[in-house]
Amino acid sequence: MGSRGCSCWLLSLALLCSLAAAKEQYHEFVIRETTVKRLCKSQSIMTVNGQFPGPTLEIKEGDSLIINLINRGRYNVTLHWHGVRQMRTGWSDGPEYVTQCPVRPGQSYRYRFTVAAQEGTLWWHAHSSWLRATVYGALLIRPRDGTSYPFHVQPTRELAPILLGEWWDMNPVDVVRAATRTGAAPNISDALTVNAQPGDLYSCSSHDTAFFPVTSGETNLLRFINAALNTELFVSLAGHNMTVVAADASYTKPYTTSLLLLAPGQTTDVLVTFDQPPGRYYLAARAYASAQGVPFDNTTTTAIFDYGAANNASSAAIAMPTLPAYNDTTAATAFTTNLRGLRKAELPSRVDESLFFTVGVGLFNCTNATAQQCGGPNGTRFAASINNVSFVLPSSTSILQAHHHGAPGGVFTADFPASPPVQFDYTAQNVSRALWQPVPGTKVYKLKYGSAVQVVLQGTNIFAGENHPIHLHGYDFYILAEGLGNFDAGADTAKFNMEDPPMRNTVGVPVNGWAVIRFVADNPGVWLMHCHLDVHITWGLAMAFLVDDGVGELQSLEAPPPDLPLC
Protein backbone atom coordinates (compact mmCIF):
# COMPACT_ATOMS: atom_id res chain seq x y z
CA MET A 1 0.00 0.00 0.00
CA GLY A 2 1.38 3.43 -0.96
CA SER A 3 1.97 6.13 1.60
CA ARG A 4 -1.04 8.11 0.36
CA GLY A 5 -3.34 5.09 0.64
CA CYS A 6 -1.97 4.31 4.08
CA SER A 7 -2.62 7.87 5.23
CA CYS A 8 -6.21 7.77 4.02
CA TRP A 9 -6.77 4.41 5.73
CA LEU A 10 -5.35 5.71 9.02
CA LEU A 11 -7.52 8.84 8.80
CA SER A 12 -10.63 6.75 8.21
CA LEU A 13 -9.71 4.46 11.10
CA ALA A 14 -9.20 7.45 13.40
CA LEU A 15 -12.60 8.86 12.40
CA LEU A 16 -14.32 5.53 13.04
CA CYS A 17 -12.64 5.21 16.43
CA SER A 18 -13.72 8.75 17.29
CA LEU A 19 -17.31 8.00 16.37
CA ALA A 20 -17.22 4.73 18.28
CA ALA A 21 -15.96 6.49 21.40
CA ALA A 22 -18.83 8.98 21.38
CA LYS A 23 -21.87 7.94 23.39
CA GLU A 24 -25.52 8.89 23.60
CA GLN A 25 -27.12 9.62 26.95
CA TYR A 26 -30.85 9.65 27.65
CA HIS A 27 -32.34 11.50 30.61
CA GLU A 28 -35.87 12.26 31.75
CA PHE A 29 -36.35 15.74 33.19
CA VAL A 30 -39.69 15.96 34.96
CA ILE A 31 -40.81 19.48 35.84
CA ARG A 32 -42.81 19.41 39.04
CA GLU A 33 -43.50 21.37 42.20
CA THR A 34 -41.35 20.59 45.22
CA THR A 35 -41.55 22.04 48.71
CA VAL A 36 -38.28 23.33 50.17
CA LYS A 37 -37.45 25.39 53.25
CA ARG A 38 -35.24 28.47 53.03
CA LEU A 39 -34.89 31.50 55.32
CA CYS A 40 -37.16 29.99 57.98
CA LYS A 41 -40.17 29.28 55.73
CA SER A 42 -41.38 26.52 53.43
CA GLN A 43 -42.15 27.30 49.82
CA SER A 44 -43.32 25.38 46.77
CA ILE A 45 -40.93 25.79 43.83
CA MET A 46 -40.58 24.37 40.35
CA THR A 47 -37.81 21.77 40.02
CA VAL A 48 -36.46 19.09 37.72
CA ASN A 49 -36.91 15.62 39.20
CA GLY A 50 -37.50 17.18 42.62
CA GLN A 51 -33.88 18.37 42.80
CA PHE A 52 -32.71 21.89 43.63
CA PRO A 53 -30.36 22.63 41.94
CA GLY A 54 -31.31 20.24 39.20
CA PRO A 55 -29.40 17.17 38.00
CA THR A 56 -25.78 17.52 36.91
CA LEU A 57 -25.18 16.17 33.40
CA GLU A 58 -21.71 14.67 32.88
CA ILE A 59 -20.58 13.83 29.37
CA LYS A 60 -17.44 13.65 27.25
CA GLU A 61 -16.68 15.78 24.25
CA GLY A 62 -18.46 14.37 21.22
CA ASP A 63 -21.28 12.73 23.19
CA SER A 64 -24.94 13.25 22.35
CA LEU A 65 -27.78 14.00 24.73
CA ILE A 66 -31.47 13.21 24.54
CA ILE A 67 -33.39 15.01 27.28
CA ASN A 68 -37.07 14.10 27.52
CA LEU A 69 -38.71 17.10 29.19
CA ILE A 70 -42.01 16.14 30.83
CA ASN A 71 -43.96 19.09 32.19
CA ARG A 72 -45.96 18.18 35.27
CA GLY A 73 -45.81 21.72 36.62
CA ARG A 74 -48.31 24.55 36.32
CA TYR A 75 -46.40 26.83 33.95
CA ASN A 76 -45.30 26.67 30.33
CA VAL A 77 -41.59 25.85 30.22
CA THR A 78 -38.61 25.38 27.91
CA LEU A 79 -35.01 24.42 28.63
CA HIS A 80 -31.87 26.10 27.26
CA TRP A 81 -28.48 24.36 27.13
CA HIS A 82 -26.43 27.44 27.88
CA GLY A 83 -23.28 27.65 25.76
CA VAL A 84 -23.90 24.50 23.70
CA ARG A 85 -23.26 25.40 20.06
CA GLN A 86 -26.26 23.40 18.79
CA MET A 87 -24.71 23.00 15.34
CA ARG A 88 -27.68 22.65 12.95
CA THR A 89 -29.90 21.66 15.92
CA GLY A 90 -31.46 25.03 16.69
CA TRP A 91 -34.76 23.31 17.49
CA SER A 92 -33.14 22.20 20.74
CA ASP A 93 -31.75 25.58 21.81
CA GLY A 94 -34.77 26.34 23.96
CA PRO A 95 -35.70 30.05 24.30
CA GLU A 96 -39.48 30.18 24.19
CA TYR A 97 -41.05 31.72 21.09
CA VAL A 98 -37.60 32.11 19.53
CA THR A 99 -36.71 28.51 18.59
CA GLN A 100 -39.79 26.70 19.89
CA CYS A 101 -43.18 27.15 21.45
CA PRO A 102 -43.20 26.35 25.17
CA VAL A 103 -43.97 22.92 26.55
CA ARG A 104 -47.36 23.27 28.18
CA PRO A 105 -48.42 21.50 31.41
CA GLY A 106 -49.08 17.85 30.66
CA GLN A 107 -46.97 17.85 27.49
CA SER A 108 -43.43 16.71 26.70
CA TYR A 109 -40.60 17.43 24.27
CA ARG A 110 -37.29 15.72 23.53
CA TYR A 111 -34.20 17.87 23.18
CA ARG A 112 -31.62 16.15 20.97
CA PHE A 113 -28.12 17.49 20.35
CA THR A 114 -24.42 16.62 20.19
CA VAL A 115 -21.75 18.48 22.15
CA ALA A 116 -18.79 18.65 19.76
CA ALA A 117 -15.51 20.58 19.98
CA GLN A 118 -16.39 21.91 23.42
CA GLU A 119 -14.87 20.99 26.79
CA GLY A 120 -15.33 22.44 30.24
CA THR A 121 -18.25 23.78 32.24
CA LEU A 122 -21.60 24.77 30.76
CA TRP A 123 -25.05 24.58 32.29
CA TRP A 124 -28.73 24.30 31.54
CA HIS A 125 -31.71 26.33 32.71
CA ALA A 126 -35.33 27.15 32.05
CA HIS A 127 -35.86 29.82 29.40
CA SER A 128 -39.45 30.76 30.23
CA SER A 129 -40.48 33.63 32.48
CA TRP A 130 -38.33 33.55 35.64
CA LEU A 131 -38.49 29.79 36.11
CA ARG A 132 -34.72 29.53 35.89
CA ALA A 133 -34.57 30.88 39.47
CA THR A 134 -35.00 27.25 40.55
CA VAL A 135 -34.83 25.22 37.32
CA TYR A 136 -31.12 24.95 36.53
CA GLY A 137 -28.16 22.58 36.73
CA ALA A 138 -24.59 21.95 35.60
CA LEU A 139 -23.42 20.44 32.30
CA LEU A 140 -19.87 19.11 32.61
CA ILE A 141 -17.97 18.21 29.43
CA ARG A 142 -14.77 16.25 29.98
CA PRO A 143 -12.10 15.43 27.39
CA ARG A 144 -12.52 12.22 25.43
CA ASP A 145 -10.92 9.03 26.70
CA GLY A 146 -7.18 9.03 26.11
CA THR A 147 -6.83 12.81 26.40
CA SER A 148 -6.33 15.06 29.40
CA TYR A 149 -6.94 18.66 30.37
CA PRO A 150 -4.42 21.08 28.84
CA PHE A 151 -3.58 22.45 32.29
CA HIS A 152 -0.08 23.18 33.58
CA VAL A 153 -0.99 20.98 36.58
CA GLN A 154 -3.39 18.06 36.41
CA PRO A 155 -5.92 18.14 39.28
CA THR A 156 -5.90 15.38 41.86
CA ARG A 157 -9.68 15.38 41.65
CA GLU A 158 -12.70 17.51 40.82
CA LEU A 159 -15.03 18.90 43.45
CA ALA A 160 -18.78 19.10 42.96
CA PRO A 161 -19.80 22.03 40.73
CA ILE A 162 -20.45 25.32 42.52
CA LEU A 163 -23.69 26.90 41.33
CA LEU A 164 -24.31 30.45 42.52
CA GLY A 165 -27.91 31.61 42.60
CA GLU A 166 -30.59 33.86 44.04
CA TRP A 167 -33.55 33.10 46.30
CA TRP A 168 -36.85 34.93 46.65
CA ASP A 169 -39.19 34.55 49.61
CA MET A 170 -42.04 34.45 47.11
CA ASN A 171 -42.71 32.76 43.79
CA PRO A 172 -40.29 34.29 41.22
CA VAL A 173 -42.97 34.02 38.52
CA ASP A 174 -45.27 36.15 40.68
CA VAL A 175 -42.40 38.62 41.16
CA VAL A 176 -41.92 39.21 37.44
CA ARG A 177 -45.65 39.15 36.68
CA ALA A 178 -46.27 41.88 39.25
CA ALA A 179 -43.48 43.99 37.75
CA THR A 180 -44.80 43.47 34.22
CA ARG A 181 -48.30 44.41 35.32
CA THR A 182 -47.24 47.60 37.10
CA GLY A 183 -44.30 48.69 34.92
CA ALA A 184 -42.13 49.00 38.02
CA ALA A 185 -38.84 47.29 38.81
CA PRO A 186 -39.26 43.78 40.27
CA ASN A 187 -38.46 42.98 43.89
CA ILE A 188 -34.81 42.15 44.52
CA SER A 189 -33.90 38.69 45.80
CA ASP A 190 -33.89 37.91 49.53
CA ALA A 191 -30.71 35.83 49.50
CA LEU A 192 -27.80 34.71 47.38
CA THR A 193 -26.99 31.00 47.36
CA VAL A 194 -24.27 28.41 46.82
CA ASN A 195 -25.77 25.18 45.51
CA ALA A 196 -29.22 26.47 46.50
CA GLN A 197 -28.20 27.16 50.13
CA PRO A 198 -27.84 30.73 51.48
CA GLY A 199 -25.15 29.87 54.04
CA ASP A 200 -24.18 30.76 57.58
CA LEU A 201 -24.88 34.50 57.42
CA TYR A 202 -28.65 34.11 56.95
CA SER A 203 -31.39 33.14 59.41
CA CYS A 204 -32.28 29.45 59.70
CA SER A 205 -29.60 28.51 57.15
CA SER A 206 -26.38 27.39 58.85
CA HIS A 207 -27.46 23.76 59.23
CA ASP A 208 -27.56 23.29 55.45
CA THR A 209 -24.64 25.47 54.32
CA ALA A 210 -22.92 24.01 51.24
CA PHE A 211 -19.92 21.97 52.42
CA PHE A 212 -16.83 20.87 50.48
CA PRO A 213 -14.38 18.44 52.13
CA VAL A 214 -10.81 18.87 50.86
CA THR A 215 -7.48 17.14 51.45
CA SER A 216 -4.34 18.97 52.46
CA GLY A 217 -1.78 19.14 49.65
CA GLU A 218 -4.19 18.30 46.83
CA THR A 219 -4.82 20.46 43.79
CA ASN A 220 -8.52 20.32 42.90
CA LEU A 221 -10.56 21.51 39.94
CA LEU A 222 -13.44 23.80 40.94
CA ARG A 223 -16.19 24.68 38.47
CA PHE A 224 -18.15 27.89 39.12
CA ILE A 225 -21.48 28.74 37.47
CA ASN A 226 -23.37 31.98 38.03
CA ALA A 227 -26.99 30.89 37.80
CA ALA A 228 -28.30 34.04 39.51
CA LEU A 229 -31.06 35.88 37.68
CA ASN A 230 -30.02 39.48 38.17
CA THR A 231 -26.76 39.70 40.12
CA GLU A 232 -23.15 39.72 39.00
CA LEU A 233 -20.97 38.24 41.70
CA PHE A 234 -17.54 38.72 43.20
CA VAL A 235 -16.26 35.37 44.56
CA SER A 236 -13.31 34.60 46.83
CA LEU A 237 -12.02 31.66 48.91
CA ALA A 238 -10.41 32.70 52.19
CA GLY A 239 -6.66 32.11 52.35
CA HIS A 240 -6.38 30.54 48.90
CA ASN A 241 -5.47 31.70 45.43
CA MET A 242 -7.35 30.37 42.42
CA THR A 243 -5.80 29.77 39.00
CA VAL A 244 -8.30 30.34 36.21
CA VAL A 245 -7.92 27.72 33.46
CA ALA A 246 -11.20 28.02 31.55
CA ALA A 247 -14.18 30.34 31.09
CA ASP A 248 -17.47 29.45 29.37
CA ALA A 249 -16.03 26.06 28.34
CA SER A 250 -13.05 27.63 26.56
CA TYR A 251 -9.54 27.11 27.89
CA THR A 252 -7.53 30.12 29.05
CA LYS A 253 -3.93 30.82 29.85
CA PRO A 254 -3.42 30.21 33.58
CA TYR A 255 -4.28 33.33 35.55
CA THR A 256 -3.79 33.27 39.33
CA THR A 257 -6.03 35.52 41.40
CA SER A 258 -7.72 35.74 44.78
CA LEU A 259 -10.92 37.11 43.22
CA LEU A 260 -13.34 35.95 40.54
CA LEU A 261 -16.08 37.90 38.81
CA LEU A 262 -18.95 35.98 37.25
CA ALA A 263 -21.87 37.63 35.49
CA PRO A 264 -25.13 35.69 35.24
CA GLY A 265 -24.65 32.98 32.62
CA GLN A 266 -20.88 32.81 32.89
CA THR A 267 -18.80 29.85 34.09
CA THR A 268 -15.22 29.77 35.34
CA ASP A 269 -12.97 26.76 36.01
CA VAL A 270 -10.12 27.17 38.50
CA LEU A 271 -7.39 25.08 40.06
CA VAL A 272 -6.89 25.45 43.82
CA THR A 273 -4.05 23.93 45.82
CA PHE A 274 -5.16 23.33 49.39
CA ASP A 275 -1.90 24.23 51.10
CA GLN A 276 -3.10 26.27 54.07
CA PRO A 277 -3.11 25.27 57.76
CA PRO A 278 -5.80 22.64 58.35
CA GLY A 279 -9.10 24.26 59.22
CA ARG A 280 -12.29 25.60 57.72
CA TYR A 281 -12.39 28.37 55.13
CA TYR A 282 -15.34 30.29 53.76
CA LEU A 283 -16.03 30.65 50.08
CA ALA A 284 -18.02 33.89 49.87
CA ALA A 285 -19.90 35.66 47.08
CA ARG A 286 -21.66 38.99 46.96
CA ALA A 287 -22.90 41.45 44.37
CA TYR A 288 -20.97 43.55 41.94
CA ALA A 289 -23.55 46.34 41.63
CA SER A 290 -22.43 48.73 38.90
CA ALA A 291 -25.60 50.82 38.51
CA GLN A 292 -25.76 53.90 40.72
CA GLY A 293 -28.89 54.31 42.81
CA VAL A 294 -30.45 51.01 41.72
CA PRO A 295 -31.52 48.63 44.55
CA PHE A 296 -29.69 45.28 44.72
CA ASP A 297 -29.31 42.27 47.01
CA ASN A 298 -26.46 43.32 49.30
CA THR A 299 -26.27 40.06 51.26
CA THR A 300 -23.36 37.60 51.21
CA THR A 301 -23.63 33.87 50.59
CA THR A 302 -21.07 31.41 51.94
CA ALA A 303 -19.96 27.81 51.64
CA ILE A 304 -17.44 25.95 53.80
CA PHE A 305 -14.23 24.29 52.59
CA ASP A 306 -13.11 21.88 55.28
CA TYR A 307 -9.66 20.23 55.54
CA GLY A 308 -11.18 17.69 57.92
CA ALA A 309 -8.45 18.02 60.56
CA ALA A 310 -9.05 16.04 63.75
CA ASN A 311 -8.59 19.16 65.87
CA ASN A 312 -10.94 21.21 63.72
CA ALA A 313 -13.80 21.74 66.15
CA SER A 314 -17.06 22.86 64.55
CA SER A 315 -17.10 25.87 66.88
CA ALA A 316 -13.72 27.14 65.67
CA ALA A 317 -13.70 30.42 63.79
CA ILE A 318 -14.00 30.05 60.02
CA ALA A 319 -11.74 32.27 57.94
CA MET A 320 -13.67 34.81 55.83
CA PRO A 321 -12.29 36.31 52.60
CA THR A 322 -12.21 40.03 51.91
CA LEU A 323 -14.45 41.00 49.01
CA PRO A 324 -14.34 44.28 47.03
CA ALA A 325 -16.82 47.08 47.50
CA TYR A 326 -20.10 46.43 45.73
CA ASN A 327 -19.37 49.04 43.05
CA ASP A 328 -15.67 48.29 42.54
CA THR A 329 -15.48 48.52 38.76
CA THR A 330 -11.68 48.62 38.94
CA ALA A 331 -11.63 45.13 40.50
CA ALA A 332 -14.16 43.87 37.96
CA THR A 333 -12.18 45.24 35.02
CA ALA A 334 -8.90 43.85 36.36
CA PHE A 335 -10.35 40.35 36.35
CA THR A 336 -11.94 40.39 32.90
CA THR A 337 -9.00 42.04 31.14
CA ASN A 338 -6.52 39.50 32.50
CA LEU A 339 -8.22 36.59 30.72
CA ARG A 340 -6.42 35.31 27.62
CA GLY A 341 -7.17 32.42 25.31
CA LEU A 342 -4.94 29.38 25.72
CA ARG A 343 -4.03 29.18 22.04
CA LYS A 344 -3.65 31.57 19.13
CA ALA A 345 -7.04 32.74 17.96
CA GLU A 346 -8.44 31.56 14.64
CA LEU A 347 -9.73 34.99 13.69
CA PRO A 348 -11.13 35.68 10.22
CA SER A 349 -8.89 37.94 8.17
CA ARG A 350 -11.86 39.97 6.94
CA VAL A 351 -15.04 41.38 8.50
CA ASP A 352 -18.17 41.03 6.37
CA GLU A 353 -20.64 42.50 8.85
CA SER A 354 -19.52 45.38 11.07
CA LEU A 355 -22.31 46.12 13.55
CA PHE A 356 -22.67 48.71 16.29
CA PHE A 357 -25.22 47.86 19.01
CA THR A 358 -26.17 50.17 21.86
CA VAL A 359 -27.44 48.37 24.96
CA GLY A 360 -29.23 49.93 27.88
CA VAL A 361 -32.29 50.60 29.99
CA GLY A 362 -34.95 53.18 29.09
CA LEU A 363 -38.52 54.12 29.91
CA PHE A 364 -41.86 53.91 28.11
CA ASN A 365 -44.16 56.89 28.49
CA CYS A 366 -47.63 56.05 29.81
CA THR A 367 -49.96 58.06 27.60
CA ASN A 368 -52.74 55.45 27.35
CA ALA A 369 -52.26 53.45 30.55
CA THR A 370 -53.69 53.63 34.05
CA ALA A 371 -51.66 54.80 37.02
CA GLN A 372 -51.51 51.19 38.26
CA GLN A 373 -49.62 50.27 35.07
CA CYS A 374 -47.12 53.10 35.33
CA GLY A 375 -45.01 52.26 38.38
CA GLY A 376 -41.72 53.40 36.88
CA PRO A 377 -40.03 56.75 37.55
CA ASN A 378 -42.34 59.76 37.09
CA GLY A 379 -45.28 57.67 35.92
CA THR A 380 -43.45 55.64 33.26
CA ARG A 381 -42.83 51.95 32.57
CA PHE A 382 -39.36 50.42 32.57
CA ALA A 383 -37.99 49.33 29.20
CA ALA A 384 -34.69 48.14 27.74
CA SER A 385 -33.38 47.89 24.21
CA ILE A 386 -30.64 47.19 21.69
CA ASN A 387 -30.26 49.95 19.09
CA ASN A 388 -33.45 51.50 20.48
CA VAL A 389 -35.51 48.39 19.64
CA SER A 390 -37.20 46.83 22.66
CA PHE A 391 -37.57 43.14 21.80
CA VAL A 392 -41.07 41.65 21.92
CA LEU A 393 -41.56 37.88 21.87
CA PRO A 394 -44.14 36.58 19.39
CA SER A 395 -47.00 34.45 20.69
CA SER A 396 -48.56 32.65 17.73
CA THR A 397 -45.46 30.65 16.78
CA SER A 398 -41.69 30.78 17.25
CA ILE A 399 -39.41 32.88 15.06
CA LEU A 400 -37.52 29.78 13.92
CA GLN A 401 -40.72 27.98 12.92
CA ALA A 402 -41.96 31.02 11.00
CA HIS A 403 -38.61 31.29 9.22
CA HIS A 404 -38.45 27.57 8.42
CA HIS A 405 -41.93 27.62 6.89
CA GLY A 406 -41.21 30.82 4.96
CA ALA A 407 -43.99 32.69 6.72
CA PRO A 408 -42.51 35.52 8.77
CA GLY A 409 -45.53 37.77 8.25
CA GLY A 410 -47.02 38.84 11.55
CA VAL A 411 -44.27 37.05 13.50
CA PHE A 412 -41.06 38.99 12.84
CA THR A 413 -39.40 41.43 10.47
CA ALA A 414 -35.82 41.21 9.16
CA ASP A 415 -34.98 44.89 9.59
CA PHE A 416 -33.06 45.07 12.85
CA PRO A 417 -30.76 48.11 12.49
CA ALA A 418 -27.00 47.62 12.09
CA SER A 419 -26.38 50.80 14.09
CA PRO A 420 -28.41 53.01 16.43
CA PRO A 421 -30.94 55.28 14.70
CA VAL A 422 -29.49 58.32 16.47
CA GLN A 423 -25.85 58.85 17.40
CA PHE A 424 -25.26 60.67 20.70
CA ASP A 425 -22.90 60.82 23.66
CA TYR A 426 -23.84 57.34 24.86
CA THR A 427 -22.22 57.60 28.29
CA ALA A 428 -23.02 61.23 29.12
CA GLN A 429 -24.36 62.03 32.58
CA ASN A 430 -27.51 63.73 31.29
CA VAL A 431 -28.79 61.96 28.19
CA SER A 432 -31.70 63.81 26.59
CA ARG A 433 -35.12 62.53 27.66
CA ALA A 434 -36.02 62.39 23.96
CA LEU A 435 -33.71 59.35 23.70
CA TRP A 436 -35.13 57.44 26.66
CA GLN A 437 -38.07 55.76 24.92
CA PRO A 438 -37.33 52.76 22.64
CA VAL A 439 -39.56 51.32 19.93
CA PRO A 440 -41.07 47.86 20.59
CA GLY A 441 -40.65 45.25 17.87
CA THR A 442 -39.77 41.68 16.92
CA LYS A 443 -36.86 42.31 14.59
CA VAL A 444 -34.01 40.04 13.46
CA TYR A 445 -30.74 40.77 11.67
CA LYS A 446 -30.03 38.45 8.73
CA LEU A 447 -26.55 37.00 8.22
CA LYS A 448 -25.23 35.01 5.29
CA TYR A 449 -23.81 31.63 6.17
CA GLY A 450 -20.06 31.89 6.72
CA SER A 451 -19.96 35.66 7.11
CA ALA A 452 -17.44 37.12 9.56
CA VAL A 453 -19.29 39.29 12.07
CA GLN A 454 -17.93 41.98 14.36
CA VAL A 455 -20.20 43.63 16.92
CA VAL A 456 -19.35 46.69 18.99
CA LEU A 457 -21.52 46.50 22.12
CA GLN A 458 -21.83 50.03 23.49
CA GLY A 459 -23.33 50.58 26.93
CA THR A 460 -25.51 53.65 27.41
CA ASN A 461 -26.23 55.86 30.39
CA ILE A 462 -29.91 56.28 29.57
CA PHE A 463 -31.65 56.19 32.95
CA ALA A 464 -28.77 54.28 34.61
CA GLY A 465 -25.56 52.87 33.18
CA GLU A 466 -24.83 49.29 34.19
CA ASN A 467 -22.62 46.34 33.34
CA HIS A 468 -24.63 44.21 30.90
CA PRO A 469 -23.74 40.50 30.50
CA ILE A 470 -24.62 39.88 26.85
CA HIS A 471 -25.14 36.22 25.88
CA LEU A 472 -25.23 34.94 22.30
CA HIS A 473 -27.02 31.65 21.66
CA GLY A 474 -25.56 29.17 19.18
CA TYR A 475 -22.06 30.64 19.13
CA ASP A 476 -18.85 31.29 20.98
CA PHE A 477 -17.13 34.56 20.15
CA TYR A 478 -13.77 36.22 20.65
CA ILE A 479 -13.67 39.27 22.92
CA LEU A 480 -11.21 41.53 21.10
CA ALA A 481 -11.25 44.43 23.56
CA GLU A 482 -13.27 46.30 26.14
CA GLY A 483 -13.05 49.78 27.59
CA LEU A 484 -14.81 52.64 29.34
CA GLY A 485 -16.56 55.58 27.71
CA ASN A 486 -17.68 55.74 24.08
CA PHE A 487 -16.05 53.40 21.56
CA ASP A 488 -13.68 55.30 19.27
CA ALA A 489 -13.06 53.28 16.11
CA GLY A 490 -9.87 55.15 15.32
CA ALA A 491 -8.20 54.83 18.70
CA ASP A 492 -9.77 51.69 20.13
CA THR A 493 -9.32 49.38 17.13
CA ALA A 494 -5.58 49.60 17.80
CA LYS A 495 -6.24 48.00 21.20
CA PHE A 496 -7.72 44.82 19.72
CA ASN A 497 -6.12 41.60 20.93
CA MET A 498 -5.74 39.64 17.71
CA GLU A 499 -3.32 37.09 19.18
CA ASP A 500 -4.98 35.36 22.15
CA PRO A 501 -8.36 36.96 22.95
CA PRO A 502 -10.59 34.97 25.29
CA MET A 503 -13.44 33.03 23.73
CA ARG A 504 -16.76 33.13 25.57
CA ASN A 505 -20.51 32.95 25.05
CA THR A 506 -21.34 35.73 27.53
CA VAL A 507 -19.48 39.06 27.70
CA GLY A 508 -19.83 41.72 30.36
CA VAL A 509 -20.21 45.07 28.62
CA PRO A 510 -18.63 47.44 31.17
CA VAL A 511 -20.78 50.04 32.91
CA ASN A 512 -20.73 53.12 30.66
CA GLY A 513 -18.28 51.32 28.41
CA TRP A 514 -17.99 48.98 25.45
CA ALA A 515 -16.84 45.55 24.31
CA VAL A 516 -16.05 44.24 20.82
CA ILE A 517 -16.74 40.65 19.81
CA ARG A 518 -16.13 38.69 16.61
CA PHE A 519 -17.45 35.36 15.31
CA VAL A 520 -18.14 33.48 12.07
CA ALA A 521 -21.81 32.81 11.28
CA ASP A 522 -21.37 29.10 10.56
CA ASN A 523 -24.48 27.81 12.37
CA PRO A 524 -27.78 28.23 10.50
CA GLY A 525 -30.88 29.11 12.48
CA VAL A 526 -32.30 31.83 14.69
CA TRP A 527 -30.05 32.81 17.58
CA LEU A 528 -31.05 35.07 20.43
CA MET A 529 -28.63 37.69 21.76
CA HIS A 530 -29.72 39.18 25.07
CA CYS A 531 -28.73 40.59 28.42
CA HIS A 532 -28.49 37.76 30.95
CA LEU A 533 -29.87 39.95 33.70
CA ASP A 534 -33.39 38.54 33.51
CA VAL A 535 -34.94 41.83 34.56
CA HIS A 536 -33.44 43.38 31.42
CA ILE A 537 -34.52 40.70 28.95
CA THR A 538 -37.98 40.99 30.50
CA TRP A 539 -37.89 44.69 29.58
CA GLY A 540 -36.72 43.95 26.02
CA LEU A 541 -32.90 43.98 26.00
CA ALA A 542 -32.59 41.37 23.26
CA MET A 543 -32.44 40.79 19.51
CA ALA A 544 -31.96 37.78 17.25
CA PHE A 545 -29.66 36.86 14.38
CA LEU A 546 -31.17 34.87 11.52
CA VAL A 547 -28.37 32.90 9.86
CA ASP A 548 -29.26 31.54 6.42
CA ASP A 549 -28.49 28.00 5.33
CA GLY A 550 -25.24 27.48 3.48
CA VAL A 551 -24.62 24.98 0.68
CA GLY A 552 -25.68 21.39 1.18
CA GLU A 553 -26.99 19.39 4.11
CA LEU A 554 -24.03 19.97 6.45
CA GLN A 555 -24.51 23.74 6.22
CA SER A 556 -28.27 23.66 6.68
CA LEU A 557 -30.62 23.59 9.65
CA GLU A 558 -31.97 20.13 10.39
CA ALA A 559 -35.67 19.47 9.83
CA PRO A 560 -37.92 20.20 12.82
CA PRO A 561 -38.54 17.20 15.09
CA PRO A 562 -42.00 15.58 14.98
CA ASP A 563 -42.73 16.36 18.65
CA LEU A 564 -41.99 20.09 18.40
CA PRO A 565 -44.54 21.80 20.69
CA LEU A 566 -47.39 23.80 19.21
CA CYS A 567 -48.30 27.26 20.42
From Swiss-Prot:
GO molecular function: copper ion binding; hydroquinone:oxygen oxidoreductase activity; oxidoreductase activity
Binding residue positions for Cu cation 4: H468, C531, H536
Cofactor(s) this protein cannot do without: Cu cation
Plastocyanin-like domain residues: 30-146, 158-310, 415-551
Gene3D superfamilies: Cupredoxins - blue copper proteins
One BP term from GO: lignin catabolic process
Gene Ontology cellular-component annotations: apoplast
Residue sites binding Cu cation 3 per the record: H127, H473, H530
Reactions catalysed according to its record: 4 hydroquinone + O2 = 4 benzosemiquinone + 2 H2O
Signal peptide: 1-22
Presence of the UniProt keyword Metal-binding in the record: yes
Keywords, ordered alphabetically: Apoplast, Copper, Glycoprotein, Lignin degradation, Metal-binding, Oxidoreductase, Repeat, Secreted, Signal
Glycan-linked positions: N76, N187, N241, N298, N312, N327, N365, N368, N378, N388, N430
EC number: 1.10.3.2
Any single Pfam family the record assigns to this protein: Cu-oxidase_2
Group of enzyme by EC: oxidoreductase
Annotated residues for binding of Cu cation 1: H80, H471
Record note on cofactor: Binds 4 Cu cations per monomer.
Residues that, per the record, bind Cu cation 2: H82, H125, H532
Cellular location(s): Secreted, Extracellular space, Apoplast
Similarity annotation: Belongs to the multicopper oxidase family.
Functional note: Lignin degradation and detoxification of lignin-derived products.
Protein name as it appears in the record: Laccase-23
Species: Oryza sativa subsp. japonica (Rice)
Organism lineage: Eukaryota, Viridiplantae, Streptophyta, Embryophyta, Tracheophyta
Gene encoding the protein: LAC23
